[in-house]
Structure formats: structure tokens, C-alpha cells
């Protein structure tokens, strides 16, 4: 899962910069609205909303903004109507790319995404063309200092639907089945382990190694996609070279 780690690490640094200038609040607001609309305003019974609230808090989004977004999603306040879409395509080197969007204008967003793919030498594909190369997983990150033994943690969580527990630099990443994410989060909370990040993501089944030149083109494409306000998440099966991670 090293490719996921590299792109995530780059994106995490970028997200901090986005948060500092308030850009990320637009994306967080849309996710809160959609989550509350689809599953109701109670995070105790709505995992997606629970995760969205945690992300908003981590980005220092004001509580009033969070509450208003949830109220809009629940229908208690008027607001823009958003729809979700998943775009699939290929980037430089033939790597697979998934783009999750939340938009108030699908035609505009589709044109924007297509333009970005084309500008970077990629192509959009039909629905299902590349999504089969990914699996939907719950992803939980912990500070490594909270985990004395990876083996013990793995044994402790195996009955909760955990697929894997990996040690990565100064963090520990737990991968779960989507419907197990909430149970694992509850258990970690009960035993006093603080979660740094928890999300539902598309994880590649296999990664594709790319050259440094291809990696730079792919990274430029991913970053431009991520900069679009309508784009919520971008996933790829590209195993980006270490040198690119060090430069960011």
C-alpha cells in the first residue's frame, strides 16, 4: 500500500496549506451536506457524517459552519443542491485514476475533469473501466506511539473486520471492510486510542511502478484535479517515486 501512502502524504501536506487559506472548507461543507442528506443529521447512526465531522474538525472548521452544513443537508436550512459522481480514467503511463466529485452542475464539472485529463495526457473512460482495479476500504490512521505492538493490535482487531494493520514511518494504518469502520472506531475510542484520520477510500488492488518523468506528470495531474472545488477525492494506482514525495 506504499503508493497510497505516498500520494496521501503529498495530499496531506497540500491539504494543510488549503486549510490555512480556507479553500478546503468548500469541499468539507459539501461533504457534510451530502452526508447529512443521505444518512440523517445524527453522527452516531451515520458513519459518513461522523467521518465528515472529524475531517472538518481536524481542518479547524468553525463549529457554526459545521452545524449549518448539517442543517442544510437535513433540510432544515435552504442551500444549493449537490449531486455526486465518480469519474474514471487513465493518466500518464496508463495508470488508473478515480475522481470523486460533489457538484451543483454536472455538465460543468464533467467538462473541467475531462479538460484536466486531456491537458496532462490522460483520457476519461467509461464507468467501470478502471474502478474494478480498486476496493472500497475503511482507512484509520493512528500515531505510532499509541501502538506498543502491531501484532497485538492486529489480533485485538481481527474480530472487528480488520483486513490489515501496517506500520508506516511514524504512523499505523488500519484497513477495514467498509461496514466495519464504525465498529473499529468505537473500539479504539473505548480503549483510549486516539485516531488521527478515518475515512472510506478506494484502495488499489495492485500498484503500477512509474518512472520519475511519468511520476511528475501524474502528480501534476492529481494536484490539478484536487485543486478543483468540485473534486472531493482523487485516487490512483500509481506507485510514485520516493523522490517526488521528498520534494513536496
Curated annotation (Swiss-Prot):
Q: Where is the signal peptide?
A: none
Keywords annotated in UniProt: Cytoplasm, DNA-binding, Transcription, Transcription regulation
GO terms in the biological process aspect are: regulation of DNA-templated transcription
Principal localization?
Answer: cytoplasm
InterPro entries membership: Integrase-like_N, TACO1_YebC-like_2nd/3rd_dom, TACO1_YebC_N, Transcrip_reg_TACO1-like, Transcrip_reg_TACO1-like_dom3, YebC-like
- Parts of the chain that traverse the membrane: none
Q: Which GO terms describe its molecular function?
A: DNA binding
Superkingdom of origin organism = Bacteria
- Establish whether keyword Secreted is in the entry: no
| Similarity comment: family membership | Belongs to the TACO1 family.
Annotated protein name in UniProt: Probable transcriptional regulatory protein COPRO5265_0905
Species source reads Coprothermobacter proteolyticus (strain ATCC 35245 / DSM 5265 / OCM 4 / BT)
Amino acid at each position: 500500500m506504499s503508493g497510497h501512502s505516498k500520494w496521501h502524504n503529498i495530499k496531506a501536506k497540500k491539504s494543510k496549506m488549503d486549510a490555512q487559506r480556507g479553500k478546503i472548507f468548500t469541499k468539507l461543507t459539501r461533504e457534510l451536506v451530502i452526508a447529512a442528506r443521505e444518512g440523517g443529521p445524527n453522527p452516531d447512526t451515520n458513519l459518513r457524517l461522523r467521518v465528515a465531522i472529524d475531517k472538518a474538525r481536524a481542518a479547524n472548521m468553525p463549529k457554526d459552519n459545521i452545524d449549518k452544513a448539517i442543517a442544510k443537508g437535513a433540510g432544515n436550512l435552504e442551500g444549493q443542491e449537490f449531486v455526486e459522481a465518480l469519474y474514471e480514467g487513465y493518466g500518464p503511463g496508463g495508470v488508473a485514476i478515480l475522481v470523486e466529485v460533489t457538484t451543483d452542475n454536472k455538465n460543468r464539472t464533467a467538462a473541467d475533469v475531462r479538460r484536466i485529463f486531456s491537458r496532462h495526457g490522460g483520457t476519461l473512460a467509461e464507468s467501470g473501466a478502471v474502478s474494478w482495479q480498486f476496493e472500497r476500504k475503511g482507512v484509520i490512521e493512528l500515531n505510532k506511539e499509541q501502538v506498543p505492538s502491531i501484532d497485538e493490535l492486529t489480533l485485538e482487531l481481527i474480530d472487528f473486520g480488520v483486513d490489515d494493520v501496517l506500520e508506516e514511518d511514524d504512523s499505523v494504518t488500519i484497513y477495514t471492510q467498509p461496514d466495519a469502520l464504525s465498529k473499529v472506531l468505537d473500539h479504539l475510542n473505548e480503549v483510549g486510542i486516539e485516531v488521527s484520520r478515518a475515512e472510506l477510500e478506494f484502495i488499489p488492488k495492485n500498484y503500477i511502478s512509474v518512472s520519475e518523468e511519468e511520476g511528475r506528470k501524474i502528480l501534476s495531474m492529481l494536484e490539478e484535479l484536487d485543486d478543483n472545488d468540485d473534486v472531493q477525492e482523487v485516487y490512483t494506482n500509481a506507485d510514485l517515486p520516493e523522490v517526488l514525495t521528498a520534494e513536496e
